[in-house]
Amino acid sequence: MKKIEAIIRKCPYCTVGITDSEGNPYVIPMNFAYRDGIIYLHSGPEGGKVTMAEHHPRVCITFCEGHELVYMHRQVACSYSMKSRSVMCHGSVRFIEDMDEKRRILDIIMQQYVDYEFKYSEPAVRNVKIWEIKVDKMTCRSFGLRPSEV
């Protein structure tokens, strides 16, 4: 589990797969934080992705770390691969409405990116949508890595 969490922490963003109103997949990059089996996201208070998550709260979140082209034989196309690791998480979105809880989670999200504290104005906290996803399934995969690198 520590290796999986290390991959997540190396990622500057994740991609979130949601289902739209017609049942089609909708995948978007989002900033995030991960702590204790929970993924936190933030967005504007309304819009397409919020509406989709309200109607279809099941999501798939992917993290991918490392992007190096490798090959076994330079002249054999099928021997090429991308050297990387990925983590796929499944869970359900719950939107956080409590103002103090939103501030706490905003701190967690910002700690993912910077090492200093923020103060949040009342309107800023009120106008942000905080997504909480408790991960109920997590898988990991590596590509193009030697066994010693996995």
Predicted regions and their residues:
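Short, structured patches in soluble enzyme cores that scaffold and shape functional sites
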Residues: 18-20, 63-65, 135-137
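Beta-strand-connecting loop/turn residues
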Residues: 37-38, 57, 136-138
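Helix-adjacent hinge/juxtasegments
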Residues: 49-73, 78-80
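Charged, gly/pro-rich active-site loop segments
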Residues: 68-150
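Short, basic/aromatic recognition patches
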Residues: 1-15
